[in-house]
């Protein structure tokens, strides 16, 4: 019995270590994303995959009757957003966002990184609508050849705004082992604010309010959650029921239900209480991390990229929508971040972290062009047209892979430079210690330094005096 318990504990520890590794969890999610794309387009598996994705599951006495693919997006992804909410609360209280002055540059860079991509996206799609093969003001979908008005295509402006922190950190972990921790801290702060802004975007632009009275229920659930998670002994069954009710009411209200996770996460205490050694928000986020990284995100990625294309060919890369997303994420994201960093430090008078220059952030800024999770979600919310949504998600996947590849090369080179600099500094330090230890450079004999000699004397009034002889 003890052996079984020990084995289970060991297995759970291994799972938590895998989930905590940005590199491994990022590669797992990428693997599921590519698997979804392959399964949806291989003749042998396409029908079975579509059947599973479109199988409906419903909850009695509610309007919840969704296909499995949507349950992955609206249900499972709530675990990820709950983890984000808990981490945000901790960062706002005791983490990188607790001191706005210290975090000012990455916070502003997050804003800049969300402004530039939509501008480039709209510029590229507008250009294609004028010079493309279709009628002026329209764009041609590569997959079906159908004509789409620019006004409809422009609904996807928010798709390239988000950064996938898990993938960005995975790229850093893979290619940037010798980089200073300040670069990772900068990226973490930027991505945290990016997540917050993406949540606001979804709430404001991609929610359709159905009935105001649901918000009363949401507020009641929020208040009960805030009370229950502050009790000395948390009643987890009651907390779970309240969380599920908040999710259902969000759905009924027309707000994207994953935001229920963010709401309750932000209401969780982030300081030590009842004599506990660590904040509850931090502990709960750590416990949820395996479910988020190894369950919710991979399954979501599987169905999000599992879109069927009638003609799966390299011509998809020539799609105006795909090109616009590649330009927006691969060029727009780093351009917005670096431009904002330069303006903040050279014009605004703000300072980067000690030892960091604006140009040091270029490789990490390119990594911020990895969209994935939230970009997939926004693509499915922004486009009601199934073909547009499919091409948008494909564009996000391609753009993210390109951004990951470019940032990987840049980070690897940057890491080698930092490694050489650190090695040279260490060698210089060893040489200095060797010189000091061996006495190299010291004179072969020493002469006693000339010092003044004191001759005490007495003044006429009897006061003691000192006569200093410099001739000695």
Swiss-Prot record:
InterPro entries: Na/H_antiporter_dom_sf (IPR023171), NhaA (IPR004670). GO terms for biological process: regulation of pH. The keyword Ion transport applies. It holds the Pfam family Na_H_antiport_1. Residues 427-436 have a biased composition (Acidic residues). HAMAP family: NhaA. This is Na(+)/H(+) antiporter NhaA. It comes from Bifidobacterium longum (strain NCC 2705). The gene is nhaA.
């Amino acid at each position: 019995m003890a052996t079984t318990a020990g084995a289970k504990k060991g297995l759970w520890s291994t799972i938590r270590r895998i989930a905590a590794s940005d590199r491994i969890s990022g590669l797992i999610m990428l693997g599921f994303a590519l698997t979804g794309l392959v399964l949806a387009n291989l003749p042998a598996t396409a029908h079975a995959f579509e059947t599973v994705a479109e199988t409906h599951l419903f909850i009695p006495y509610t309007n919840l009757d969704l296909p499995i693919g949507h349950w992955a997006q609206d249900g499972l992804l709530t675990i990820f957003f709950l983890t984000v909410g808990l981490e945000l609360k901790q960062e706002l209280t005791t983490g990188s966002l607790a001191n706005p002055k210290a975090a000012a540059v990455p916070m502003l860079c997050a804003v800049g990184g969300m402004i530039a991509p939509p501008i480039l996206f709209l510029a590229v799609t507008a250009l294609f609508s004028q010079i493309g093969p279709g009628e002026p003001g329209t764009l041609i979908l590569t997959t079906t050849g159908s004509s789409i008005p620019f006004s409809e295509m422009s609904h996807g402006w928010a798709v390239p705004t988000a950064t996938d922190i898990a993938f960005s950190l995975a790229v850093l972990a893979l290619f940037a082992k010798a980089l200073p921790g300040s670069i990772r801290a900068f990226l973490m702060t930027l991505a945290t604010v990016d997540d917050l802004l993406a949540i606001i975007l979804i709430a404001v632009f991609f929610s359709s309010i159905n009935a105001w009275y649901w918000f009363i229920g949401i507020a009641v659930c929020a208040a009960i959650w805030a009370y229950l998670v502050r009790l000395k002994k948390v009643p987890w069954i009651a907390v779970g029921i309240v969380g599920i009710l908040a999710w259902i009411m969000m759905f009924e209200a027309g707000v994207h239900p994953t935001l229920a996770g963010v709401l309750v996460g932000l209401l969780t205490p982030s300081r030590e209480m009842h004599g506990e050694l660590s904040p509850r928000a931090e502990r709960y986020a750590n416990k949820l991390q395996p479910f988020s990284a190894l369950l919710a995100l991979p399954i979501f990625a599987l169905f999000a990229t599992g879109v069927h294309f009638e003609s799966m060919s390299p011509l998809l890369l020539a799609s105006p929508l795909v090109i616009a997303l590649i330009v927006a994420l691969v060029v727009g994201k780093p351009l917005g971040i670096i431009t904002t960093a330069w303006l903040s430090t050279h014009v605004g008078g703000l300072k980067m972290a000690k030892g960091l220059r604006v140009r040091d952030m270029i490789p990490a800024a390119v990594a911020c062009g990895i969209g994935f999770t939230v970009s997939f979600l926004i693509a499915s919310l922004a486009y009601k047209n199934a073909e547009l949504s499919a091409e948008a998600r494909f564009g996000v996947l391609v753009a993210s892979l390109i951004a990951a590849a470019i940032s990987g090369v840049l980070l690897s080179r940057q890491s080698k430079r930092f490694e050489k600099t650190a090695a040279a500094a260490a060698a210089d330090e060893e040489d200095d210690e060797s010189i000091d230890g061996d006495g190299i450079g010291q004179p072969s004999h020493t002469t006693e330094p000339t010092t003044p000699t004191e001759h005490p004397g007495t003044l006429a009034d009897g006061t003691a005096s000192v006569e200093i002889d410099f001739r000695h």
